[in-house]
Regions:
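Amphipathic, small/basic residue-rich leader segments at the start of a protein or domain
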Residues: 1-86, 107, 111, 260, ...
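Glycine-rich phosphate/cofactor-binding loops in nucleotide/flavin-utilizing enzymes
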Residues: 69-70, 91, 232-247, 334-380
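A structural signal for short hydrophobic beta-strand segments in well-ordered beta-sheet cores
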Residues: 137-139
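Glycine-rich beta->alpha junctions and the first turn(s) of the following alpha-helix
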Residues: 3-5, 195-290, 355
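A short, Trp-centered hydrophobic/proline-enriched beta-strand micro-motif
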Residues: 115-123, 166-167
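C-terminal helix-coil-helix/basic helical segment that borders enzyme active sites and/or dimer interfaces
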Residues: 28-37, 266, 270-277, 288-344
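Internal helix-loop-helix
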Residues: 47-110, 114-115, 157-163, 287, ...
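A short core secondary-structure module
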Residues: 144-145, 149-198
Length: 380
């Protein structure tokens, strides 16, 4: 494993830094977390800037190391994250790039890269979260369309999305068809008749998630990514990107927050508490280790062809808990100020509670690590 950067990679870093120094001072103020239409406009405008500068495809066509450099430098510079483009850039886009037909790639990828279209994720259901393969949303063929009925929950960005990466059951579960089979991956247009979206307000006041109800929604068969009943395999590609790369920029952000916490503690007198200093030191070591793990995962992805491997589950497991510990420490540093919902760290602390659940619970990640890395049996 080689964790050093080549001259070409360092040149990429230098060029990116120069570009960021020019464009970031000109950006408008970021909308509030509660203003999702405003956030969509802001996030897609940022993506268009990246596209025009030649950085729009960095999540797909660049090498894994260049993606890592991009996420590191944009976060250090305080640039916007992917925001409303999250599903399109980090879930659906890489999946379509890997599994889609040439026609599908030509249709869906350029609008995502330009910031013209936003995607949401329709995976989880009220009775199919961690056990995603238990999903019940049904799709049946009617000529050159699928007719879809069912419901989804925790649908990211549904309120502002143009498209949905949707998992449906196209064959009922039976002795001949286990639940992991009979699933199909569809690209559903969000303006199709029969779709009802109800926003879900989080503890932090955001409505980035929603319930979605589907009543005989017609989706063209041409919008199927992969083969019918082979959607679980396609979904594993999606989830490998979600767990392998989607949180990389956040590690850089957490390391920055650690420095800010130390400065805040020195300023408000809490730095004199040795227990707090030990806590922050332990977190610093944890996030340094997570960054090295990220570099290792990226090195492995580059060696094996670009798709993140199961090492992403190790990262997701450790990062979820470390993030919660970080913002618990932030509450200790802020004291009574941690009750102020206008403070960024307070909102981050509330949102961190979901990290051991979202994108696969910690228990699911432990199972993946046990079975696919340690080779332990599946017996319970």
């Amino acid at each position: 494993m080689d964790l050093t950067y080549t001259d070409e990679e360092e040149a990429f870093r230098a060029g990116l830094r120069d570009w960021l120094s020019l464009v970031l001072p000109e950006l408008p103020a970021k909308p509030s977390p509660q203003d999702w239409p405003g956030r969509r406009a802001y996030d897609t405008a940022w993506q268009r800037l990246l596209y025009d500068a030649g950085y729009g495809e960095v999540h797909w066509d660049a090498s894994p190391t260049q993606r890592l450099i991009f996420l590191e430098e944009t976060e250090k510079a305080g640039a916007p994250y992917v925001g409303a483009n999250f599903v399109g850039l980090l879930h659906a886009g890489p999946t379509i790039a890997s599994e889609g037909t040439p026609e599908q790639r030509d249709r869906w990828l350029p609008p995502v890269l330009r910031g013209d279209e936003v995607w949401c994720q329709g995976f989880s259901e009220p009775d199919a979260g961690s056990d995603l393969a238990s999903l019940r949303t049904r799709a049946w063929r009617d000529g050159d369309h699928y007719v879809v009925s069912g419901s989804k929950i925790w649908t990211s960005h549904a309120e502002v999305a143009d498209w949905c990466e949707l998992l449906v059951r196209t064959a009922p579960v039976s002795e001949a068809v286990p639940k992991h089979r009979g699933i199909t991956w569809l690209a559903m247009p969000m303006d199709a008749p029969g779709i009802t979206v109800r926003p879900l307000r989080t503890l932090a006041g955001s409505t980035e998630f929603a319930e979605m109800f589907l009543d005989d929604v017609r989706v063209p068969v041409a919008n199927r990514v992969g083969e019918e009943n082979d959607g679980w395999r396609v979904t594993m590609v999606t989830l490998s990107y979600e767990r392998g790369t989607a949180f990389v920029g956040e590690v850089v952000a957490c390391r920055r927050v650690l420095g800010e916490l130390a400065r805040e503690a020195r300023g408000n007198g809490r730095w004199g508490d040795p227990a707090l200093r030990r806590r922050l030191g332990r977190l610093s070591a944890e996030f340094s280790a997570l960054w090295r793990l990220t570099q290792w995962n990226v090195s492995e992805a580059q060696r094996t062809g670009g798709v993140p491997g199961v090492g992403g589950s190790v990262f997701k497991l450790r990062y979820s808990h470390a993030r919660q510990e970080l913002y618990d420490a932030a509450a200790e540093v802020l004291g009574a100020g941690s009750l102020d919902l206008a403070h960024e760290w307070t909102l981050d602390r509330l949102s961190s509670l979901s990290y051991t659940i979202a994108a696969g619970t910690s228990q699911i990640q432990q199972n993946i690590v046990a079975e696919r890395i340690l080779g332990l049996p599946k017996g319970r």
